[in-house]
């Protein structure tokens, strides 16, 4: 399959050889949205605010006395800061991962666009918190499994191979 014709390049043949996987990739926590839908449980990224060059991202939480805090994000381990009781979403902060690009609600449109661009593969990650909402569940969340099954079916409808990482 040649993507660019010889006429377009002055006689030089360009393009990808047959079997080349042309596609794209996404990361569930940045892209999916639907952060509290379909039985999905919370992940640390759900309590991480937006940021910029001048304002670092922060993690928001409540201490044991009920006071709200927003501290700079240093790393992604699950340990709360000293005196912390639980992570929480606080008013006045933007949590960009809550919506991402709203793939959760628009995956059919997005996958159709991927097909129009000629994608043959779509690399995606799976949000563990959509499959095991509490992190220690004995059984997976069926609604979460169905969401990913529907994505795979939609990819196959357009001849796109899902590649899960």
Report the location of each language-model feature.
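Non-catalytic accessory regions flanking glycosidase/transglycosidase catalytic cores in CAZymes
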Residues: 2-164
């Amino acid at each position: 399959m040649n993507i660019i014709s010889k006429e377009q390049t002055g006689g030089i043949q360009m393009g990808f050889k047959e079997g080349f996987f042309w596609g794209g990739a996404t990361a569930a926590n940045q892209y999916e949205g639907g952060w509290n839908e379909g039985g999905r449980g919370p992940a640390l990224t759900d309590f991480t605010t937006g940021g910029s060059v001048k304002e670092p991202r922060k993690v928001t939480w409540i201490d044991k006395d009920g006071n709200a805090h927003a501290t700079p994000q240093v790393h992604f381990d699950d340990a709360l800061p000293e005196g912390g009781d639980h992570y929480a979403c606080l008013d006045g902060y933007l949590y960009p991962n809550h919506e991402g690009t709203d793939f959760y609600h628009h995956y059919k449109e997005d996958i159709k666009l991927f097909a129009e661009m000629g994608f043959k593969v779509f690399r995606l990650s799976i949000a563990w918190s959509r499959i095991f909402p509490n992190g220690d569940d004995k059984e997976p969340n069926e609604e979460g499994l169905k969401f990913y099954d529907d994505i795979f079916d939609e990819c196959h409808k357009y001849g796109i191979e899902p590649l899960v990482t």
